[in-house]
Amino acid sequence: FILNTHHHFDHVGGNAELKKKYSSKILGFEKDKNRIPSIDVLLKDDQEFRIGNLNFRTIFIPGHTLGHIAFYLEKEKIVFTGDTLFSLGCGRIFEGTYQQMFDSLNKIKSLPGDTEIYCGHEYTNNNLEFCLKFNPNNNYLKEKEKIIKAKIKEKKPTIPTTIKEEIQTNIFLRYDDLDVKSTLNLKNA
């Protein structure tokens, strides 16, 4: 099985070749049926499905694209967020609106804190620098910086992260934090 979070080529470009080589089924959101190559299974929002002994649930999270979904495994406490939420960042808005992205980030933010996040790209170090610029007094972020730098030095991945860590450190989930608002001159927003 190949699960597609959205239609961008860097995520679906190998679908046909992988499908042919491994006789895989391609799964994706129904709204992207004409944009995900070789799609076999059209998924709906909040749809549950099973692969082997794993139970998945889709979460519709538009913003980065209009047909973006996440794959959530509640029992395993794992979510695949594609390009909507990254470690210490979020994806660019290509097709959706800022309100859609805001709502989608809040959907992800509402998952249990110990849920592991597997995102579509490894931008952690760049995102760290960005977050430190706008949230320099965040002690959780300073601690996470040490962990990230150590992992990079040891050539280890910085993914996964968790919902709890992202709520504490990711400025895109800390929009209501007074320190972040102050740095952005948005105290009254």
Regions found by a protein language model. Name each.
Residues 12-15, 39, 45-46, 52, ...:
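Surface-exposed loop/turn and secondary-structure junction residues enriched for glycine/proline
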Residues 36-132:
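Catalytic core of the metallo-beta-lactamase
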Residues 4, 31, 120, 124, ...:
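Proline- and acidic/polar-enriched loop/turn elements at helix boundaries
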Residues 106-116, 125-189:
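Accessory terminal helices/loops
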Residues 19-21, 97-98, 135-136:
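Glycine-rich, phosphate-binding/catalytic loops in enzymes
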Residues 1-58, 147:
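Active-site HxH/HxHxD metal-binding segment of metal-dependent hydrolases
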